[in-house]
């Protein structure tokens, strides 16, 4: 037994290092050098092929514009305040109940203040009335960064925060700010005048992408009451001169146009579902994405 164990232990040690043949784990130094050299060259070639493929692919991709722009989905429509579950519930007599919503709006509108748009090297005036899309050249760096249209906060009227720092919440007349999400190169195509029935008090302009808010269900439509829209030129929509968007590299300070809606006569103590939709020839809607071209929000004003 002892001899067998000694012999077995000796063969195991001999496999690790054979002093007679100068072998380590069954290979000589020259053999180990050759096999290591082979794998270094083999994996080096694989890495070279991989890096070369990536470099060729990067040559076909522009950092300023997506290659497959036609496959990008239409932009989403979202609201501020941005809250979880898109539910707004508050009591006008209790400032704490709507503080979160007001702070959310204040923070969002910070970059729309006049003091944040003073740099004439970055911002430019694009008029006070809606006009056609403003082309700023090709999507490349030949002309450097492109200027951005200013957006005046006072266009948002009662929802600007200039005269009412609570944006109507203390009076039970809440405001929401609506924006169209940024899609690089997207140019909205408004619908024809006769293809859309406009709400009372709203008007058509071929250079405005219209937005309308209504009750989501039949019972909601009766409880929404009246509402007011505030935007450039008092149009309920987004003026086209703010498009197309050239991306963060070419327009890092871009300000998307805004539309404010104030609900002035909501039925109290009732949860009301409100749907807002943008209308356009290239605006789409999806059952899988409830923010594509539209959104709905629940609002409850408590007594």
Curated annotation (Swiss-Prot):
Major localization class: membrane
Listed PANTHER family: SODIUM/POTASSIUM-DEPENDENT ATPASE BETA SUBUNIT, SODIUM_POTASSIUM-TRANSPORTING ATPASE SUBUNIT BETA-1
Q: Which UniProt keywords apply?
A: Cell adhesion, Cell membrane, Disulfide bond, Glutathionylation, Glycoprotein, Ion transport, Membrane, Phosphoprotein, Potassium, Potassium transport, Signal-anchor, Sodium, Sodium transport, Sodium/potassium transport, Transmembrane, Transmembrane helix, Transport
What membrane topology does the annotation report for this chain? Single-pass type II membrane protein
Pull the Extracellular topological domain ranges from the record. 63-303
Which residues, renumbered to this chain, are glycosylated? 158, 193, 265
InterPro entries associated with the record: Na/K_ATPase_sub_beta, Na/K_ATPase_sub_beta_sf
Compartments where found:
Cell membrane; Apical cell membrane; Cell membrane, Sarcolemma
Q: Which organism is it from?
A: Oryctolagus cuniculus
Q: Does the keyword Glycoprotein apply?
A: yes
Protein function: This is the non-catalytic component of the active enzyme, which catalyzes the hydrolysis of ATP coupled with the exchange of Na(+) and K(+) ions across the plasma membrane. The beta subunit regulates, through assembly of alpha/beta heterodimers, the number of sodium pumps transported to the plasma membrane.
Cysteine disulfide partners in this protein: 126-149, 159-175, 213-276
Protein name as annotated: Sodium/potassium-transporting ATPase subunit beta-1
- What's the superkingdom here? Eukaryota
Q: Membrane side Cytoplasmic: which residues?
A: 1-34
Oligomeric form and interacting partners: The sodium/potassium-transporting ATPase is composed of a catalytic alpha subunit, an auxiliary non-catalytic beta subunit and an additional regulatory subunit. Interacts with catalytic subunit ATP12A. Interacts with regulatory subunit FXYD1. Interacts with regulatory subunit FXYD3. Interacts with NKAIN1, NKAIN2 and NKAIN4. Interacts with MLC1. Part of a complex containing MLC1, TRPV4, AQP4 and HEPACAM. Interacts with KIRREL3. Interacts with OBSCN (via protein kinase domain 1).
Transmembrane feature ranges: 35-62
Region immunoglobulin-like: start-end pairs: 191-303
């Amino acid at each position: 037994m002892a001899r067998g164990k000694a012999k077995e232990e000796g063969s195991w040690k001999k496999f690790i290092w054979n002093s007679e043949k100068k072998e380590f784990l069954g290979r000589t130094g020259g053999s180990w050098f050759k096999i290591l050299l082979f794998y270094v060259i083999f994996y080096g070639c694989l890495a070279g092929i991989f890096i070369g493929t990536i470099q060729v692919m990067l040559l076909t991709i522009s950092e300023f514009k997506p290659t497959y722009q036609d496959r990008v989905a239409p932009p989403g429509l979202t609201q501020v305040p941005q809250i979880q579950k898109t539910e707004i519930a508050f009591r006008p007599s209790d400032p704490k109940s709507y503080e979160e919503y007001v702070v959310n709006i204040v923070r969002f509108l910070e970059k729309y203040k006049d003091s944040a748009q003073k740099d004439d090297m970055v911002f430019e005036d694009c008029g006070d009335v809606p006009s056609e899309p403003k082309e700023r050249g090709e999507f490349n760096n030949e002309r450097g960064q492109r200027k951005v249209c200013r957006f005046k906060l006072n266009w948002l009227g009662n929802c600007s925060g200039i005269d009412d720092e609570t944006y109507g919440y203390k009076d039970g007349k809440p405001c929401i700010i609506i924006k169209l999400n940024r899609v690089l190169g997207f140019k909205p195509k408004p619908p024809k005048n006769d293809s859309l029935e406009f709400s009372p008090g709203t008007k058509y302009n071929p250079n405005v992408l219209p937005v309308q808010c209504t009750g989501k269900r039949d019972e909601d439509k009766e409880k929404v009451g009246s509402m007011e829209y505030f935007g450039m030129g008092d149009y309920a929509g987004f003026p086209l001169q703010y498009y197309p968007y050239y991306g963060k590299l070419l327009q890092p300070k871009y300000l998307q146009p805004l539309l404010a809606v104030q609900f002035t006569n909501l039925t109290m103590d009732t949860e009301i579902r409100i749907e807002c939709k943008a209308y356009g020839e290239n605006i789409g809607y999806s059952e899988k994405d409830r923010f594509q071209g539209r959104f709905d929000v629940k609002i409850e004003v408590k007594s």
